[in-house]
């Protein structure tokens, strides 16, 4: 489990506890929440644990050694830290499936390590594919790893394709065009501001942007939902996962979040996957695929839902959507710049350095600056370099003041 203390990680571990006869947790990686890692070690008895920050390793050892004897796990895991430690845990020999739940581009290198080791991958970390598809997709083909989408929208598409002759393409998820798949509709809740006017966004606060009406998620992805950048990134992910052109991927606002996405087939049939908004369902499907496990979870009752509504997104209210389509069509290193600029812009917003409406402005400025330096066939080092450049570009622009200010000349 990559990112065991985050939203995806904690929900995945809850599923493992619900089905102890089916799933065994052998490796955990985490960021800074040491006390929660200790609890997870006590509950799941992993063979190895890796912390992203090596300076926290002594604290983890101290907390484990301080446990009363009756609370000690049967065996202490091997403890690792830093980038190399994450990579070792991600490619741990006894793991059959790696769930990638690290937020942002920080998950790229450990996810690649898992792929190179031939592990099947449940991908909740969409940024890995968005920023580095030119690197990740060839590596998937070389290793034979199967990539299973763990976010709700792409899981819905994946599930809808299971009953078609093209399920094998979807199973491998290596960007192979899927014959007969004519259109994808990605549903979006509309985020925290779906019922706000574009004018009212001038008054948006951090508390407003981090209050999602339907889903329980981390702060960064909740802000991405409010800007609709999350859905824009999912458009790029769908392009790479299912080999479909951007003109055939549409975003539709669906406030109830009951239909998680839909596909249109050659004969005009439309298939959708429905369920309550709960991330556990797509995670479970990745863990159990191709089987479906019996759960005691709440069943969908359409009479209780009452109505399902849809509307087109307002492009003026959600400029990040247009930025994502443009970056996806540009390809190469541009999606990596888009992703890194967005991560940094959201971080600046959450630290109260910029306004909510500044987020798309600084992202667009970084993408514009990158156009002359776009690389169409980047290697891993190229992706990492433009990622660092885009973050620095946003930081420098924020230092210069508010939105619509030109970027200074920068080097990576």
From Swiss-Prot:
Which cofactor does this sequence's record say it needs?
A: Mg(2+); Mn(2+)
The record's GO molecular-function terms, alphabetically, read:
1-deoxy-D-xylulose-5-phosphate reductoisomerase activity; manganese ion binding; NADPH binding
Which one GO biological process term can you cite for this protein? isopentenyl diphosphate biosynthetic process, methylerythritol 4-phosphate pathway involved in terpenoid biosynthetic process
Keywords in alphabetical order, please. Answer: Isoprene biosynthesis, Manganese, Metal-binding, NADP, Oxidoreductase
Among Gene3D superfamilies, the record links this protein to: 1.10.1740.10, NAD(P)-binding Rossmann-like Domain
Task: Give the record's pathway.
Answer: Isoprenoid biosynthesis; isopentenyl diphosphate biosynthesis via DXP pathway; isopentenyl diphosphate from 1-deoxy-D-xylulose 5-phosphate: step 1/6
Binding site residues for 1-deoxy-D-xylulose 5-phosphate: 126, 152-153, 189, 212, 225, 230-231, 234
- What HAMAP family does the database record attribute to this sequence? DXP_reductoisom
Q: Which family does it belong to?
A: Belongs to the DXR family.
Entry function:
Catalyzes the NADPH-dependent rearrangement and reduction of 1-deoxy-D-xylulose-5-phosphate (DXP) to 2-C-methyl-D-erythritol 4-phosphate (MEP).
State what protein this is by name. 1-deoxy-D-xylulose 5-phosphate reductoisomerase
Whose protein is this, by species?
A: Prochlorococcus marinus (strain MIT 9313)
Q: Which gene encodes it?
A: dxr
């Amino acid at each position: 489990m990559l990112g065991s203390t985050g939203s995806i990680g904690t929900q995945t571990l809850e599923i493992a506890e619900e089905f102890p006869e089916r799933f065994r947790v052998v490796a955990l990686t985490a960021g800074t929440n040491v006390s929660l890692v200790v609890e997870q070690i006590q509950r799941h008895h992993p063979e190895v644990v890796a912390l992203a920050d090596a300076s926290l390793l002594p604290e983890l050892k101290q907390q484990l050694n301080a446990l009363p004897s009756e609370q000690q796990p049967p065996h202490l895991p091997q403890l690792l830290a830093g980038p190399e430690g994450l990579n070792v845990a991600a490619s741990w020999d006894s793991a059959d499936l790696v769930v990638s739940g690290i937020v942002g581009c920080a998950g790229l290198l450990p996810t690649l390590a898992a792929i190179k080791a031939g592990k099947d991958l449940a991908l909740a970390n969409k940024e890995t594919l968005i920023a580095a598809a030119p690197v990740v997709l060839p590596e998937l083909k070389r290793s034979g790893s199967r990539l299973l989408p763990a976010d709700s929208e792409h899981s819905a598409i994946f599930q809808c394709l299971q009953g078609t002759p093209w399920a094998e393409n979807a199973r491998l998820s290596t960007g192979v065009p899927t014959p007969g798949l004519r259109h994808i509709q990605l549903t979006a809740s509309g985020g925290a501001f779906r019922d706000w006017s574009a004018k009212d966004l001038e008054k948006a606060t951090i508390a407003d942007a981090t209050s999602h009406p339907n889903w329980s998620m981390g702060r960064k992805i909740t802000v991405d939902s409010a800007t609709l950048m999350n859905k824009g990134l999912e458009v790029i992910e769908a392009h790479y996962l299912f080999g479909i052109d951007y003109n055939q991927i549409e975003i539709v606002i669906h406030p109830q979040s009951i239909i998680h996405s839909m596909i249109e087939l050659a004969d005009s049939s439309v298939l959708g996957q429905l369920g309550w908004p709960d991330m556990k369902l797509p995670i479970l499907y990745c863990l159990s695929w191709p089987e479906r496990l019996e759960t005691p979870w709440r069943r969908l009752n359409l009479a209780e839902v009452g109505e399902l509504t849809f509307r087109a997104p307002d492009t003026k209210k959600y400029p990040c959507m247009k930025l994502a389509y443009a970056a996806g069509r540009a390809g190469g290193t541009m999606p990596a710049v888009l992703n890194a600029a967005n991560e940094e812009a959201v971080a600046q917003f959450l630290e109260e350095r910029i306004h909510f409406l500044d987020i798309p402005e600084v992202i667009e400025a970084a993408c514009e600056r990158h156009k002359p330096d776009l690389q169409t066939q980047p290697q891993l080092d190229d992706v990492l370099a433009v990622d660092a450049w885009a973050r620095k570009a946003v930081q420098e622009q924020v230092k210069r003041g508010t939105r619509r200010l030109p970027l200074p000349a920068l080097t990576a």
